[in-house]
Amino acid sequence: MVKPRQREYPTLKSSLNIIRETALIAISCVFWIYCLVVLLVYIGTIFEIHDESINTIRVALNIENTEILDIFETMGIFAIIIFVFFTISILIQKWQKGRES
């Protein structure tokens, strides 16, 4: 009788392209820095922080305070509408399940 042996698993040989991986990391870092800058400008606008760097970035991005506040107002209205819609949907589902049982 043949004694059982451990299975031999094939090894995975990987050769990463260093240039491609470096480019992906660089693009990702640039994207995250841009996101942080925009977040900083939005927070500065919401809390009415009049800092020179925030104002400079706002001018470079060609954004006015009123535009940002209008965007947040619109987002708030849509968030309320979606909240009401989903709340009513859940209540209707619970009401229908209550009638069935």
Curated annotation (Swiss-Prot):
It is found in: Cell membrane. One of its GO terms (cellular component) is plasma membrane. Keywords: Cell membrane, Membrane, Transmembrane, Transmembrane helix. InterPro entries: IcaD. It is a multi-pass membrane protein. The chain crosses the membrane at residues 24-46, 71-93. Its main location: membrane. NCBIfam families: PIA_icaD (TIGR03932). Belongs to the IcaD family. Necessary for the synthesis of poly-beta-1,6-N-acetyl-D-glucosamine (PNAG, also referred to as PIA), a biofilm adhesin polysaccharide. Is required for full IcaA N-acetylglucosaminyltransferase activity. This is Poly-beta-1,6-N-acetyl-D-glucosamine synthesis protein IcaD. It comes from Staphylococcus aureus (strain MRSA252).
